[in-house]
């Protein structure tokens, strides 16, 4: 797994974290899922590829980010969260494929169980391997997007399929699959409990360093109360580099604030120096007037 996967995926695997996210994303803040009623399912799915028949393996392993089975309202549901740091322009096809394989796995399991018990009665049941009226568990997939840029990709199969106006009759025959996207920019943080409210509010600042500094300064108490895992996940979502020497339990968002301020100060200094260089001041003169190390200014000149 990549660095982001090594931090964010394990964060979602925590049952309380996952329940808080799904309760906000799917149930609009109602506390429906409870940690004691969910269990982890395998992330790997085996997909048959019938078109690969030239001697290569006709199986492909799909790995989903977080897969949980939840029991509520006398039923089981499979909830899945996929994490995205970048826009994916084929997301509807990708998610439709993943969910289809998930349903296929359920069906194969039912078919094996029915074959083992030997209680299929009609020829239609024997053919399908399922009892008449047999139901599968719902599969609910949510995409959590934390990228810097607003999502500008398709969120439905309809958006991906070429359908001219004079062929509108075909629309009802095409899959109506939709991607359920959670993006901090258009999500109400108040629907989320636990650390998620603060995480989503912080992510709303996007890549605007000034907005992020203002938010962190005005929400210092809430950020300090984030768990160590939540702080590390949030910093990773923000694209902050968690260096090895800082990769400790006590590293928090508020400790990262000082780095943000230093970076903002440095960026302002570089902006001023480049402006003076453009006005044909020499590095030596700039060093004198700004009381800065000339070697630092020389490095900026080299990078121009």
Describe the role of every protein-language-model region.
Residues 1-304:
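Elongated, amphipathic alpha-helical interaction scaffolds
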């Amino acid at each position: 797994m990549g660095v982001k996967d090594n931090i964010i995926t394990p964060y979602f695997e925590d049952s309380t974290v996952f329940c808080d996210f799904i309760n906000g994303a799917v149930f609009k803040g109602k506390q429906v899922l409870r940690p004691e009623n969910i269990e982890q399912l395998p992330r790997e799915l085996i997909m048959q590829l019938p078109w690969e028949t030239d001697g290569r393996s006709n199986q492909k392993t799909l790995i989903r980010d977080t897969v949980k089975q939840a029991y509520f309202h006398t039923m089981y549901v499979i909830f899945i969260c996929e994490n995205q740091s970048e826009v994916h322009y084929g997301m509807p096809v990708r998610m439709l494929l993943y969910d289809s394989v998930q349903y296929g796995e359920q069906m194969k399991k039912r078919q094996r169980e029915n074959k083992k018990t030997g209680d299929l009665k009609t020829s239609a049941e024997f053919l399908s391997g399922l009892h008449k009226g047999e139901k599968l568990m719902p599969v609910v997939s949510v995409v959590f997007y934390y990228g810097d840029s607003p999502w500008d990709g398709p969120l439905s199969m309809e958006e991906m399929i070429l359908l001219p106006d004079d062929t509108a009759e075909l629309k009802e025959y095409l899959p109506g699959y939709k991607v359920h996207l959670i993006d901090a920019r258009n999500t109400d943080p108040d629907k989320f409990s636990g650390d998620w409210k603060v995480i989503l509010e912080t992510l709303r600042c996007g890549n605007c360093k000034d907005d992020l500094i203002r938010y962190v300064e005005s929400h210092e108490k809430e950020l300090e109360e984030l768990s160590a895992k939540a702080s590390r996940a949030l910093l990773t979502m923000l694209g902050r580099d968690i260096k090895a020497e800082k990769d400790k339990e006590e590293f928090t968002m508020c400790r990262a604030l000082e780095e943000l301020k230093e970076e903002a100060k440095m960026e302002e200094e570089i902006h001023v120096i480049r402006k003076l260089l453009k006005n044909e001041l020499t590095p030596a003169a700039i060093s004198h007037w700004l009381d800065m190390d000339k070697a630092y200014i020389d490095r900026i000149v080299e990078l121009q």
